[in-house]
Amino acid sequence: MGRLFDNSAAKDLKALLPVTLTFADLNGVEKTAPLPRKLAVDGMPDGDDPRVSDLGYWSPDGDLVIYYGDVGYWRGISRIGEVDGDIPAVLRNTGEFSATVESA
């Protein structure tokens, strides 16, 4: 479970739902999955410093990201939502895994 924020990238992601994505671990702090297309980032900040359990969009590569560690500020990160669910369940997936992102 989770929620999307009210911004252009989140609205564009919602238009893609439902979508099944393949996530992989990156640097022991985030799970990333390429989206079928890049999202709109109109009016979004140039970068952000996501928190643990944030849902993000990495605009340089068009990836959806679940943060479970501190990555610090990076240009190209947009916070688009937050995960209310079980982050430890995400961590148990050490290799690639598929998940369907859908609207409640």
Q: Can you say where each PLM-predicted feature lies in the sequence?
A:
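Beta-strand-rich cores of mature extracytoplasmic or soluble domains
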Residues: 59-83
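A generic structural signal for short, solvent-exposed coil/turn residues
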Residues: 13-15, 58, 72, 91-93
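A structural detector for beta-sheet-dominated domains
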Residues: 5, 24, 100-102
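Short, surface-exposed binding/anchoring microloops in extracellular/periplasmic proteins
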Residues: 1-15
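Solvent-exposed coil/turn segments that connect beta secondary-structure elements
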Residues: 5-7, 18, 61, 69-71, ...
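Mature extracytoplasmic domains of secretory-pathway proteins
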Residues: 15-62
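Well-ordered alpha/beta subsegment
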Residues: 80-104
